[in-house]
Amino acid sequence: MNDNQMLRVLVTGASGFLGGNILRALRINPRIRPIAACRDSRKISRWFSGDVREGDLIDPQYRRELSKDVDVICHAGTWASMWNHAEIERTHFLAPTCDLIDAAIRNGVRRFIFANTVAIAAKVKDGRPIDDFAPKQHTGYWPHLDRLIDVDDYMHANSTRGMQMVNLRLGHFIGVGNRLGIVPALTPRLRTYLVPWLAGGRKHLPLVADSDLGQAFMRACVAEGLDNYESFNICGTEFPTLREVVSFIAAETGFPKPLYSVPYPAGYAFGWLMETLNPLLPGSPFLTRSIVHLCEDWVCPNDYATRKLGYLPGKDWRSAIREHLADLKAQGYPWPRLCQVV
């Protein structure tokens, strides 16, 4: 984006954890005029004084109008569940997102930046690094992840229609305000003494902190020399093991560390059982296959994003988790629903 005009950047999901951190990063760049999009403008952070386009992304008319007079879209407004809900994932996430892309192309948007995950890549067993364009693999058991892959495929297929497509393969979120992810899912479960190590906790997690997420989107908005389709790993400064992360959470909270270890196939089998029994039990499943999937080996270097976007993560994962845990403690370490409200 190399002209001298103010860049009009629309952020969907602006009232959420990711959208809020994107807005926070955009507002410090004098070249950018951020525009917030969300269902309820009252939930947007009070410090934001820019334009707000209120509406629901499942409304076709709202989608058609949303991207008018916009240069860049940061799409963080996605519906998500950690298990099942295949039909809702199609109607509330996949179809609206693809339609939003089409509307943005018609309205002359120049760049579409999508919040994806490193976990769309095919799993590796030897811990080798996973690059930014690594082949993807549908799981067959986690509808949301599979639809994320479908959106990425749709972006790639439509990247020659005049709007650049930027797929950000984000690491696992950590930071104040996050309620659907690995830390809020694991923390209250540790209190039960029922959480095991997975294969001794030796695999590596791709954590990424709140401020680094915002930085990545801001840099993706203004970067020059991008191809029609781009994919970038966006992770933190290092890749701690599952054992390091869980041990840190236990030390900070006083909750017990796991007392035993199980292999990954056993974790997936127990997750399947809990998902299957969920209709008969209250609340969300104790364990889902998606949680096990997120605890696989995800060493996804940032080198390409550093080279083309100038992205350099700066927040240590321990500091981000410490802040995250303080936020969860203030709420009584709530048991997460693992599914957003429809």
Regions from the language model: what does each represent?
Residues 219-286, 302, 308, 317-318, ...:
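Mid/C-terminal beta-alpha module of Rossmann-like enzyme folds, strongest
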Residues 6-29:
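N-terminal Rossmann NAD(P)H-binding glycine-rich loop of SDR-like oxidoreductase domains
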Residues 158-205, 210-211, 249:
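NAD(P)-dependent short-chain dehydrogenase/reductase
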Residues 126-173, 178:
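Catalytic helix-loop patch of NAD(P)-dependent Rossmann-fold dehydrogenases
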Residues 88-99, 107, 146-147, 208:
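Glycine-rich NAD(P)-binding loop of the Rossmann-fold in SDR/ketoreductase-type enzymes
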Residues 42, 46-95, 103:
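NAD(P)H-binding glycine-rich loop region in Rossmannoid oxidoreductase-like domains
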Residues 98-145:
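Conserved Rossmann-fold NAD(P)-dependent oxidoreductase catalytic core, especially the SDR/UDP-sugar
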